[in-house]
């Protein structure tokens, strides 16, 4: 009933929220979570590109819409912190200022790695402690071990489920229909 009272301009937000509130296999309106305007983004996304995401996890991560689709899928599984951590590490590696490097390193650690972090990633004790030690003298590689573990976890666990998900299969179907 509350959805009926919302202004029309919020329809996109309702669609996104509705999509994310369901299990990944029940979300068929993938366009709602694309980073650009859905119709324009879907027109730019070729069937070939979306199909290539199945070639490897790294191919998926190298594509803007692949990351957006995978993020939306992970949200339905309540595990988007893994991708967010991986992306934060990638951005961290681009840091050139030593002062910013230190503050960013501590921010990433506190948000994702520390025990009881708000978006704590699932890594083992040894990796967590090695990362903590690396923060004593932060460098561009201080998160490499933890990032590698999270990458491996997503690649072996979440990525195969994403490729089998209705969300991904619907996206492929939509992009193929657009070509017809």
UniProtKB/Swiss-Prot annotation:
Specify the RGS domain's residue ranges.
Answer: 56-171
What highest taxon heads this organism's lineage? Eukaryota
Gene Ontology biological process terms from the UniProt entry: G protein-coupled acetylcholine receptor signaling pathway; G protein-coupled receptor signaling pathway; negative regulation of signal transduction; positive regulation of GTPase activity; regulation of dopamine receptor signaling pathway
Membrane topology per the entry is: Peripheral membrane protein
Phosphoserine (modified residue): where?
26
Keywords assigned: Cell membrane, Cell projection, GTPase activation, Membrane, Nucleus, Phosphoprotein, Signal transduction inhibitor
Gene3D superfamilies per record? 1.10.196.10, Regulator of G-protein Signalling 4, domain 2
Q: Which InterPro entries match?
A: RGS, RGS_RGS8, RGS_sf, RGS_subdom1/3, RGS_subdomain_2
What does the UniProt entry say about where the protein is found?
Cell membrane; Membrane; Perikaryon; Cell projection, Dendrite
Q: Which GO terms describe its cellular component?
A: cytoplasmic side of plasma membrane; dendrite; neuronal cell body membrane; nucleus; perikaryon; plasma membrane; synapse
Entry GO MF terms: GTPase activator activity; GTPase activity
| Bilayer-spanning residue ranges | none
Answer whether the UniProt record assigns the keyword Transmembrane to this protein. Answer: no
Oligomeric and partner information: Interacts with GNAO1. Interacts with GNAI3.
Q: What does this protein do?
A: Regulates G protein-coupled receptor signaling cascades, including signaling via muscarinic acetylcholine receptor CHRM2 and dopamine receptor DRD2. Inhibits signal transduction by increasing the GTPase activity of G protein alpha subunits, thereby driving them into their inactive GDP-bound form. Modulates the activity of potassium channels that are activated in response to DRD2 and CHRM2 signaling.
Q: What is this protein called?
A: Regulator of G-protein signaling 8
**What organism is this sequence from?**
Homo sapiens
């Amino acid at each position: 009933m509350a959805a009926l009272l919302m202004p029309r301009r919020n329809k996109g937000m309702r669609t996104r929220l509705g999509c994310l509130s369901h299990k990944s296999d029940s979300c068929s309106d993938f366009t709602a979570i694309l980073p650009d305007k859905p119709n324009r983004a879907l027109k730019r996304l070729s069937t070939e590109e979306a199909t290539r995401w199945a070639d490897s996890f790294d191919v998926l991560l190298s594509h803007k819409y692949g990351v957006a689709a995978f993020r939306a899928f992970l949200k339905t599984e309540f595990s988007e912190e893994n991708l967010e951590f991986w992306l934060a590490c990638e951005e961290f590696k681009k840091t050139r200022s030593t002062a910013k490097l230190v503050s960013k390193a501590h921010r990433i650690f506190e948000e994702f790695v520390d025990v009881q972090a708000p978006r704590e990633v699932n890594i083992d004790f040894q990796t967590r402690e090695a990362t903590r030690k690396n923060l004593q003298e932060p460098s561009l590689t201080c998160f490499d071990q933890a990032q590698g573990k999270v990458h491996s976890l997503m690649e072996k666990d979440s990525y195969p489920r994403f490729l089998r998900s209705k969300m991904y299969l619907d996206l492929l179907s939509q992009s193929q229909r657009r070509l017809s």
